[in-house]
Amino acid sequence: MPNQDLLKVNALSISFFGEGIEKKIIKSISFALRQNEITAIVGESGSGKSVSSLAIMGLLPKGISKITSGSIWFEDNDLVKVDNNAFQKIRGNEIAMIFQEPMSSLNPSMRCGKQVEEILKQHTKLSNSEIKTEVIDLFEKVKLPKPLRIFKSYPHEISGGQKQRVMIAMAIACKPKLLIADEPTTALDVTVQKDILDLLKDIQEETKMSILFISHDLSLVSELADKVLVMYKGEIVEQGDTSSIFKNPKHNYTKALIAARPSADFRLKQLPTISDFMSNEVDKTIISKEDRLNRHKTLYAQEPLLEVIDVEKTYLSKSGLFSKDVPFKAVDGVSFKVYPGETIGLVGESGCGKSTLGNAILQLDKATSGIIKYKGNDITVLEKKELRELRKDIQIIFQDPFASLNPRLTVGNAIMEPMKVHNVGNSSAERKEKVLDILNKVGLEGSAFYRYPHEFSGGQRQRIGIARTIALEPQLIVCDESVSALDISVQAQVLNLLNDLKSQFGFTYIFISHDLAVVKYMADQLLVMNKGKIEELGDADDIYASPEKEYTKKLIHAIPKGL
């Protein structure tokens, strides 16, 4: 094997087995990763990118998966032939991995510092005091604030970004030659995501280790990787240095991944999807400034559908067991109006108060003070019966549709259940007919009616969540991080669907997200929140083009732009 190649994968094929059927997941892929290089594997869910990384780590699920052919050379070892005992010395020591969800990788009952100490105890001969000093140094290296406090904290006591930094500290503790980062920023705010990418770059430059970075977002990896491999249905369809892949993509799938993220410079009527590119049917119609101005003249000549007036939400928290309650304002004096047929974007980092405000509008969590008017009536003072009637009019699409769907109900019954509660349709037969029509409108086949939530992909489940929401014929829909857990390509499909449904049914959206690029694409008005207050409020394009506040500038700067 050539010296400069740290990792060389040759004609690797992997199959999974179930109920006597072999399913080929990885189909003869080959690539090399050099020393001191960052290579990204990009593709949507199910493309095989994570399975490839698990094979390199020797972590393929036993009994149901098998490497059917090929080799994985790491330095002078073919990892396909290495036994489990030898792999224990390589894994964590020479090859380390950061996972997508740090909460499921960290032990919830063990302090963060102790978890990193465990790695060092397993792979080094340092004394206990030396190990503690090393962990504090690692926490400083990954730029954790107050390293000693984090050392003593449990995972649930720190933020998502801090948990991911603890995971990175664990991964680099033994100074590995290769770091595999599997979607390490997917669940994080754009600003935290940028910080984590900058941190990985800094560590790589300092330690000269190689990084295999796995993501579904091509724009994101362009800011980090030297080389890109594009995976589609278990095959590498394109590979090369990052700038050539970006500036001159050859495969339609690569072109689709680049185009699926909303552009900062213009607004397409429809976001291009992978199926559009694969069938060469990309709609490049742009919504002009004039179209937008004319739409807004009509929109804002109406009476507002919703008025939020000086709303506050205060929580009481204790700083210690015997201490007094300390008030914390999650929403602090917020006022704005929403007009029929409008999409207002609510954007800000985690903890800024945007979801709390959404819940207050939905009356799921009552505001401490202030007025919320829907069609001119204050909904904060409604009785139980009136509130129930309001629920039909104001609905929500959740971030995680799987958590909001009953796993024991078929999709059809899950959608029909709230229809029955709110007297939509006169009979079961009428309701079923309507549900089948709605499933068709959200791009699902009629057979979905009889299937269960676990049988669907993330994007399909989000479509089911949308179907359940629109079945009640609401007027105002709160979309709370409705696309943040989806692949960029699937996200484009769902955003197109939301816009199509809006033009068909005249819905009004409050679109909550931490991703300013997505919100800017969807929104007429943009409301930027920070620490419970409104930072900026105005036309989405105007705020994006010339933000006034530093906080807004920071959010815009953090959006992956691509090359």
Model-based region annotation:
Residues 153-158, 162, 452-456, 460:
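Conserved ABC ATPase signature
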Residues 92, 156, 174, 454, ...:
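Conserved signature/switch motifs of ABC ATPase nucleotide-binding domains
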